[in-house]
């Protein structure tokens, strides 16, 4: 299923621009609203969607995404329900790539073979599992690749030249460069250093390199888009959703539009920038 991911990047390259990759938490604030948000993302300009798996101990996530996960869990969202949402999304959209992003525990509990079968059937294109290092590829990465699912790795500012080959081994779809140290949504990246890091990674792989963590505005997205193959935005979208909620974490009449409006701004930022070398 990496074909959808490859096709998305090919379309962006043909337009001379970076891809916009948007992250939202599955089931936030409730499953039905979450599906409407998921459906709104491509229409507002997202090229690829990352769909977060709610988990009780999200060690790499900042306050915004932690809160989103708690809202989703409170609403009864689990891995089975997340796959069901993607199946429903696929009824109306067979083009936009969907990448599940989360932690290994829910997948392990579900059962890896059953998860991979169900993910493939639901129309999942790839996985980002932040707490499975390359040394544990046999747990999920290699079985996922056998099923045609992209296993996408994170590289960070602390990933040195000795470590990078291990990070890139068995990676498919794209490489996700984390632009800051720390948790999501807590700082603004140094755009100059990010560009240098992207160049260093790109010299070692033919895969697209996308950049996330700390990207919150259309202007941020435009800066990253100059040198990266894709721009990932998550915490800012989750924040926009949270601000739209009614008391009791209930969806408001403007919840879906609050997210879509920011995606349109981010999309304009990405599309306003001609990618370096394009």
From Swiss-Prot:
EC no. given is: 4.2.1.20
Q: Which GO terms describe its molecular function?
A: tryptophan synthase activity
Q: Which organism is it from?
A: Methylorubrum populi (strain ATCC BAA-705 / NCIMB 13946 / BJ001)
UniProt-annotated catalytic positions: 50, 61
What's the protein called, per UniProt?
A: Tryptophan synthase alpha chain
* Record gene name: trpA
Asked if the record carries the keyword Amino-acid biosynthesis, the reply is yes
Per UniProt, the keywords (alphabetical) are: Amino-acid biosynthesis, Aromatic amino acid biosynthesis, Lyase, Tryptophan biosynthesis
Give the record's subunit note. Tetramer of two alpha and two beta chains.
